[in-house]
């Protein structure tokens, strides 16, 4: 018999009754019933109940051992009596009567419990993550993570993609976040950077003649933590394809994503239809966000014309003074009560706004009656036209937000979210995907009075390249600000899973694109010379995308924090509490790297 086990703790069944088995694992729980000692023994696979009588020579030892001690048990598999069968356990029809015991490791008093999984502080959980990972729910999520990544790999291979690895030590590049820098011992005063993404490398793979690339790629960014953003490092399904249009990328990734989510849906629905494509401008207007949660059926409407020149002087005055101002109408089915309208008004005040305008409709003699101060101020005709346009009836309401879209679209979007949640309008147990497309290529930088990139500077503009080269920053500023880019995001249930683009593969177009944003050729050559030079020797049109693996797992696992699907995560301050990182290093190590630390004075107060 094997030294540690003949079976796992999830393997024994009624068919094994009468056999001698050896199992190993952690003491999950101990119970003393009628003089008998019952032990739930746990390993990676499951639980098996072990029983021993008071006369057993090992009784006192097992009574003394703390839970989470590791033992090996040898004994006869016996059937449980009918009244003691545990139907919730795969091994619930049997138990092992202990004959031999080997103690592999004794546990000290635990800093956090495993059995029962009570709430515990995140600091304690992360400091003792190896114990936290024994808890069933987290343990299952980490196994789920492995299965999801395996499924992604299989699906990409089925789409004729080949996995290639890109360097971890690379050059610093001015992307969205700060780099993690690695000093070079061999080249004093110079630094590598950990890649924020394999962006330039995957494009160079296309230039190198490979057709379809993918990688489960580690990415490193020195940025602050959020619930949906892990500090320090994360993984993405990085992909790129040659001779590809935007639609080609969609046609590849959609079946991968739908298939993955369907495989791990666990009773939730994944709609069969193609992902909805929503222009960035429409997303901001309809949902107040470029990552809308489409489980919420509310689609906001531009009500600017309803209020222009109306008796509601607050909105009418804003529209008259600033042509950029927009009024959002947020329809609220079933929200037509003064109590709910007052709650929304209070919510807006907590958000730093003076309040929230509203109209609600109720039954009255002779038909519908519109209530609320806005209805009185804009008049019956405008109120009724708005109601008809939005398809609202008695018992419904409409809320209003007004301002410059750059500042107030987000507030309107949050109001939409609150209305949908409070009124229980949102779909449950489903995944709603969409593409956000047609991002603006440029935007006006009011502070510096110049044109600047709006999102991704390396995407191809939606214009004939030769026509783009003829544009002039001074005379064609309006054309440039109206120009869209071949950029796209995947969004699921309000979570941005990925950004992607058709790449700008022509050096002349790239230099011109950067010139419009105020970058001279020398700066572009210095920052991105490696990729630019490669493009000068024959670059295919190419496009790609990179869905975030951690965020996909978070959605499929049904949790709201990435740390619940990462095996060894950092805390909110990007610290590894278990390994005590970051930490000071020896002076000798710094000398070898020809660097020294200059630690700022601690902040007072």
From Swiss-Prot:
Homodimer. It comes from the Bacteria. It is an enzyme of class 6 (ligase). This is Aspartate--tRNA(Asp/Asn) ligase. It catalyses: tRNA(Asx) + L-aspartate + ATP = L-aspartyl-tRNA(Asx) + AMP + diphosphate. It comes from Maricaulis maris (strain MCS10) (Caulobacter maris). It is found in: Cytoplasm. GO terms for molecular function: aspartate-tRNA ligase activity; aspartate-tRNA(Asn) ligase activity; ATP binding; nucleic acid binding. The record marks 33 as: Important for tRNA non-discrimination. One of its GO terms (cellular component) is cytoplasm. Its EC number is 6.1.1.23. Gene3D superfamilies: Bira Bifunctional Protein, Domain 2, GAD-like domain, Nucleic acid-binding proteins. GO terms for biological process: aspartyl-tRNA aminoacylation. CDD domains: AspRS_core, EcAspRS_like_N.
């Amino acid at each position: 018999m094997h030294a540690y086990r003949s079976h796992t703790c999830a393997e024994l069944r009624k068919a094994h009754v009468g056999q001698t088995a050896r199992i190993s694992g952690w003491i999950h729980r101990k119970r003393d019933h009628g003089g008998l000692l019952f032990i739930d023994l746990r390993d990676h696979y499951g639980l098996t109940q072990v029983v021993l009588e008071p006369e057993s020579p090992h009784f006192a030892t097992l009574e003394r051992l703390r839970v989470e001690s590791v033992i090996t048990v040898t004994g006869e598999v016996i059937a449980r009596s009918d009244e003691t069968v545990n139907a919730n356990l795969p091994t619930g029809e049997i138990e092992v009567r202990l004959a031999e015991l080997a103690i592999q490791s004794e546990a000290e008093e635990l800093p956090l419990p495993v059995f029962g999984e009570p709430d515990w502080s995140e600091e304690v959980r992360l400091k003792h993550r190896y114990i936290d990972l024994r808890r069933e729910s987290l343990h299952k999520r980490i196994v789920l993570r492995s299965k999801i990544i395996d499924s992604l790999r299989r699906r990409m291979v089925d789409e004729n993609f080949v996995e290639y690895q890109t360097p971890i030590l690379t050059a610093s590049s001015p992307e969205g976040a700060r780099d993690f820098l690695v000093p070079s011992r061999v080249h004093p005063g110079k630094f590598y950077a950990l890649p924020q993404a394999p962006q330039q490398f995957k494009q160079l793979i296309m230039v190198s003649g490979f057709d379809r690339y993918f990688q489960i790629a580690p990415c490193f960014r020195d940025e602050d933590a959020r619930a949906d953003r892990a500090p320090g490092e994360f993984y993405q399904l990085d992909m790129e394809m040659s001779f590809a249009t935007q639609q080609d990328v969609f046609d590849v990734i959609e079946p991968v994503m739908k298939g993955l989510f369907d495989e791990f849906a666990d009773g939730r629905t994944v709609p069969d239809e193609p992902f909805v494509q929503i222009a960035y401008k429409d997303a901001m207007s309809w949902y107040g966000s470029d990552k809308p949660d489409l489980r919420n059926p509310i689609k906001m409407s531009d009500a600017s014309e309803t209020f222009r020149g109306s008796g509601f002087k607050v909105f009418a005055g804003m529209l008259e003074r600033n042509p950029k101002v927009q009024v959002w109408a947020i329809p609220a089915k079933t929200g037509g009560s003064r109590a709910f309208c007052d709650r929304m008004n209070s919510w807006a005040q907590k958000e730093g706004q003076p309040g929230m305008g509203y109209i609600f409709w109720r039954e009255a003699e002779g038909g519908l009656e519109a209530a609320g101060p806005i209805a009185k101020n804009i008049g019956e005709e405008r109120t009724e036209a708005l109601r008809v346009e939005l398809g609202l009836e008695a018992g419904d309401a409409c809320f209003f937000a007004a301002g410059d879209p750059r500042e107030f679209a987000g507030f309107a979007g949050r109001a939409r979210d609150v209305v949908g949640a409070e009124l229980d309008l949102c779909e449950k147990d489903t995944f709603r995907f969409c593409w956000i497309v047609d991002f603006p290529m440029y935007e006006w930088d009011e502070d510096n009075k110049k044109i600047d990139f709006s999102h991704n500077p390396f995407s191809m503009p939606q214009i004939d390249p030769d026509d783009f080269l003829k544009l002039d920053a001074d005379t064609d500023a309006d054309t440039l600000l109206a120009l869209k880019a071949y950029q796209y995001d995947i969004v699921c249930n309000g979570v941005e899973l990925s950004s992607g683009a058709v790449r700008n593969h022509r050096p002349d177009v790239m230099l011109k694109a950067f010139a419009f944003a105020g970058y001279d050729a020398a700066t572009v050559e210095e920052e991105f010379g490696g990729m630019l030079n490669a493009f000068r020797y024959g670059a295919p049109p190419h496009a790609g995308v990179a869905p975030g693996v951690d965020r996909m797992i978070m959605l499929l696992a049904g949790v709201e924090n990435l740390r619940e699907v990462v095996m060894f995560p950092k805390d909110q301050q990007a610290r590894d509490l278990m390994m005590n990182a970051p930490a000071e290093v020896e002076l000798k190590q710094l000398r070898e790297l020809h660097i020294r630390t200059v630690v700022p004075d601690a902040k007072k107060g």
